[in-house]
Design a protein with these regions (language model features):
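Intrinsically disordered, low-complexity Pro/Gly/Ser/Thr-rich segments with frequent PxxP/GP/PP motifs
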Residues: 9-24, 376-420, 436
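Beta-strand-rich ligand-recognition modules
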Residues: 17-33, 92
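Hydrophobic beta-strand positions in extracellular immunoglobulin-like domains
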Residues: 22, 42, 357-361, 375, ...
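Extracellular Ig-like/FN3 beta-sandwich strand-entry sites
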Residues: 31-37, 368, 398, 417-423
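Terminal connector regions
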Residues: 42-52, 408-462
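Extended substrate-binding grooves/exosites of carbohydrate-active enzymes
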Residues: 47-356, 360-383
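Beta-strand-rich N-terminal accessory domains
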Residues: 425, 430, 456-502
Length: 502
């Protein structure tokens, strides 16, 4: 028996096997994760002996014209790799932590996850079905420690069976989840006949999904060209080629340390070339464990090497996430949130208070977002204008908006603060109607400078005299700090850092 999300019966089928036709189906996507519920009932002479409920989503995945299509649309994969890791539970991740991860992903405009490099807790797939995330579901194959090329286990016949068995377990366990749109055969195992045979097995078992493998390269048995850490030039080279496969990097934009300064350039290319459809950032969360420092007693997050020299350690290398172990946002998370946002202001005309709003979604409007424009003068807030005209903008559509209120507010700012820097900050904030998205959460933002900062022009001789006159110097045994009207300079034994004040 199949029921809609409200429990209304749609259709039934009887027998050991059967099929149901669903009229006017509500299709599942990560943007619109509609789920039906199927009840499989086993009966005997006394009646029902067992009832199994199963949530069901209907969607289509295919590759056409070098693009990955979901329900006929060439989606953008705004993805991240996610290891199962918890600062308190280690490899044991609670449902509450999983939901927290999905909430953060929604906040950061992440719509896809690669289950690196193994099948996850079954509850994770249920949650992705429910809340809406696209999954590349990866089998637990990784053997690059044994070597590549001729040393790869993918070339040894005696290892064919485990290659197939591990993918069989992955596919057969999770085949009914609509959130899974791609199967991944494994990670960093080299390439050989074992993967070619495994690819054929998966395609025979499930004809509804593409199959990818990173080491498959351009021409081998992978439906998606999915390399890792390819730079801009090589990415653009493939996009300009006659390659017939979608280009979606399985790992890119490595998020370790002070990172993501080059994220914009990737997304400029993704939005330029149709076959370049995104990628999966490495990776989602710093892999650290909550503990106390043996020296200070304060709480820290530990990593490789903190518990002795064995087993082998790469020290802090696995702390390369968008977010910290306790799920606080790392600074570069905001860069990712911005360049992956789903709504954009274009062609801003400040004189007339006019601009275009582009909805980058493929399946939903932006009626759940409220647009405001806040005007600042030299960083001081002047006023905020509400702009309700964004309602009804269809997916992939653009709407011209003219706001008299914004035009007036900008005019007032220019007349009273004409010598100051004036900016207009647009913000699309959630109305709280979407699951796991808080009311007021800003999902997209842009800033436009309508009056540049006016730097005072001072003759060089005067500037040098003023700088010397106003210089203040402080010294300790190891550090010297010099402060002027123009800069702060900090000097130590072998380094000097100068920070300008303007």
């Amino acid at each position: 028996t199949l029921c809609d999300k409200d429990g209304k019966q749609i259709a039934t089928a009887t027998g050991a096997q059967g099929s149901i036709k669903v009229p006017n189906v509500n299709a599942w996507t990560a943007e619109t994760p509609y789920l039906y519920k199927a009840y499989i009932t086993l009966k005997n002479k006394q009646g029902a002996s067992e009832v199994i409920p199963q949530r069901v989503g209907f969607r289509n995945v295919e590759i056409k014209n070098a693009q990955l299509l979901v329900n006929g649309k060439p989606i953008l994969v705004k993805g991240a790799n996610r290891h199962e890791i918890d600062p308190d539970g280690g490899y044991v991740v609670s449902v509450e932590r999983m939901i927290q991860d999905i909430k953060i992903m929604k906040q950061l405009n992440i719509n896809a996850v690669r289950t690196c490099h193994y099948p996850d807790d079954p509850r994770w797939y249920d949650l992705c079905d429910e809340y809406g995330l696209y999954l590349t579901a990866e089998a637990n194959l990784e053997s690059h420690g044994m070597g590549y090329e001729e040393k790869s286990l993918a070339k040894f016949p005696e290892y064919l069976k485990p290659h197939i068995e591990r993918n069989e377990g992955n596919v057969k366990s999770f085949i009914n989840h609509p959130s899974i749109i791609v199967w991944s055969l494994g990670n960093e195992c080299g390439y050989g006949v074992n993967f070619e045979t495994t690819y054929d097995w998966v395609k025979a078992c499930d004809k509804t999904r593409p199959v990818q493998y990173e080491r498959g390269g351009y021409d081998s048995k992978t439906d998606i060209h999915c390399p890792m850490y390819i730079d801009y030039d090589e990415s653009e080279k493939y996009c300009k080629s006659d390659g017939t496969k979608p280009y979606i990097q399985c790992e890119y934009a490595h998020a370790m340390g002070n990172s993501e300064g080059g994220f914009k350039e990737y997304w400029d290319l993704i939005r330029k070339y149709p076959k370049y459809q995104g990628g999966y950032i490495w990776d989602f969360v710093d892999q650290g464990i909550r503990d106390k420092s043996p020296i200070t007693g304060k709480e820290i997050f530990t990593y490789g090497g903190d518990y002795g020299r064995y087993p082998a350690s790469d020290y802090n290398f696995n702390c390369n996430g968008i977010i910290a172990p306790d799920r606080r946002l790392n600074p570069h998370a905001y860069e990712i949130q911005y360049w992956q946002q789903n709504v954009w202001i274009k062609d801003f005309d400040s004189v007339n208070g006019a601009f275009n709003v582009y909805n980058e979604n493929f399946f939903k409007n932006i009626d759940d977002l409220n647009l405001t424009a806040t005007i600042y003068a030299n960083g001081v807030k002047l006023t905020t204008v509400e702009i309700p005209e964004t309602k009804g903008i269809a997916p992939q559509a653009t709407k011209l908006i003219k706001s008299d209120a914004l035009k007036y507010a900008i005019g007032e700012a220019e007349s009273k603060h004409g010598k100051e820097e004036i900016t207009v900050n647009f913000a699309f904030a959630s109305d709280g109607s979407q699951p796991l998205v808080d009311k007021g959460q800003v999902m997209a933002r842009q800033q436009f400078i309508i009056n540049d900062y006016k730097f005072e022009k001072v003759p060089a001789a005067v500037a040098e005299e003023a700088t010397a006159k106003n210089a203040k110097t402080q010294k300790t045994s190891n550090i010297e700090v010099e402060e002027t009207n123009a800069y702060v300079k900090v000097s130590a034994e072998r380094m000097t850092v100068t920070v300008g004040k303007h």
